């Protein structure tokens, strides 16, 4: 789904339902940089996983991310699940606080493993929210 402001595309999100039970994956066959996310996805089996949410920089701070988050929660609920999950890097403080203020709680975390060319540090955090 997308967010619009004055008929302009300004943001979007996408996600999917995580299989339950989670499929068996040989982590040794997976590049190391992907392992933390796969391990956390396994913890989120049965959830609807918000894989990405983004707002163009010039439109941030206007409540659009919260609106998109609400739409994602509706999509998750309509899919038949009672929980929405997401992964966020702990260094992304703005996103982390936005999720917390919208009822998401930390469930698990894994140390971030660098992608080639990345200098990110810290943990990847799995958060989720119960949907009523």
Listing of model-derived features with the role each one plays in the protein:
Residues 55, 61-74, 78, 97-101:
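Conserved acetyl-CoA-binding loop-helix of GNAT-fold acetyltransferases
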């Amino acid at each position: 789904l997308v967010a619009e402001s004055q008929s302009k595309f300004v943001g979007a999100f996408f996600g999917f339902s995580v299989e339950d039970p989670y499929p068996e994956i040989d982590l040794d066959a997976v590049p190391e940089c992907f392992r933390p996310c796969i391990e956390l996805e396994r913890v989120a089996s049965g959830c609807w996983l918000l894989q990405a949410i983004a707002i163009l920089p010039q439109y941030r701070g206007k409540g659009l991310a919260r609106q998109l988050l609400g739409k994602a929660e509706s999509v998750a609920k309509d899919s038949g699940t009672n929980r929405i999950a997401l992964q966020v890097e702990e260094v992304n403080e703005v996103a982390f606080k936005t999720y917390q203020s919208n009822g998401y709680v930390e469930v698990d975390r894994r140390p971030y493993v660098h992608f080639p060319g990345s200098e990110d540090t810290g943990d990847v955090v799995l958060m989720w929210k119960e949907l009523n």
